[in-house]
From Swiss-Prot:
Catalytic activity: pyridoxamine 5'-phosphate + O2 + H2O = pyridoxal 5'-phosphate + H2O2 + NH4(+); pyridoxine 5'-phosphate + O2 = pyridoxal 5'-phosphate + H2O2
Name of the protein in its database record: Pyridoxine/pyridoxamine 5'-phosphate oxidase
Superkingdom, natural source: Bacteria
Cofactor: record remark: Binds 1 FMN per subunit.
Enzyme class at the top of the EC tree: oxidoreductase
Gene3D superfamilies: Electron Transport, Fmn-binding Protein, Chain A
């Protein structure tokens, strides 16, 4: 960590969450809260601040985690994209719940989201897919994600095959690729403090708004 980053980290540790529990009301919007923190992470220069860990479980309760990129967030939830034949997709089809974790170390902040997961529409998936670079779209077709690969050359040859197949053409959305939305059932914000008496707030949805509670560190 650079000297400037250390100063920034020390300063942030002393801040804590800049709101008190008494000021938090059910109408407070944790999505807005999240977007403010994400923008701060972007402005700080953190590389890929939209990266997040997603944890899934098999029906037998065996967890697995991996890093993915957040591609959209709104009042409905948090959206990411993947191959529907991947391990995480198989987990989600059988056990449609997940936990997300954002960790912005320099800011000493993290956000945890837990919730139910659903596929987004094919139209939404296609809109994002067509916005990707051509190489990424070819890669989506070429990769049998999470399946055993004999050697890298096999993958290279599949890429070449699809480059030739789609040469001069639009690349369609594969049936096995698309997005998921994590619909939050809880959103927890954590702000590190130098004395280790960290600030923690957890939001949970009600029928119309959100409840919010402060948690012990």
């Amino acid at each position: 960590m650079s000297f400037i980053s250390k100063i920034r980290c020390a300063f942030t540790l002393g801040q804590g969450v800049l709101i008190e529990n008494e000021a938090l009301k059910e109408t407070n919007d944790p999505i807005l809260f999240f977007n403010n923190w994400l923008k701060k992470a972007q402005d700080t220069g953190i590389i890929l601040p939209e990266s997040m860990s997603i944890s899934t479980c098999t029906p037998e309760g065996r967890p697995s985690s991996r890093m993915v990129l957040l591609k959209e967030v709104d009042s409905k939830g948090f959206v990411f994209f993947t191959n529907y034949d991947s391990r995480k997709a198989h987990d989600l089809e059988a056990n449609p719940f997940a936990a997300l974790l954002f960790h912005w170390n320099i800011l000493q902040r993290q956000v945890r989201i837990e919730g139910r997961v659903e596929r987004i529409s094919t139209a939404q998936s296609n809109a994002y897919f067509q916005s990707r670079g051509r190489g990424s779209r070819i890669g989506a077709w070429a990769s049998h994600q999470s399946q055993e690969l004999n050697d890298r050359q096999t993958l290279v040859e599949r890429v070449k095959y699809f480059e030739e197949k789609f040469a001069g053409k639009e690349i369609p959305l594969p049936e096995f690729w698309g997005g998921y939305r994590v619909i939050p059932e809880s959103i927890e914000f954590w702000q590190g403090k130098a004395d280790r008496l960290h600030d923690r707030f957890v939001y949970q949805p009600t029928e119309k708004n959100w409840t919010v509670k402060r948690l012990n560190p």
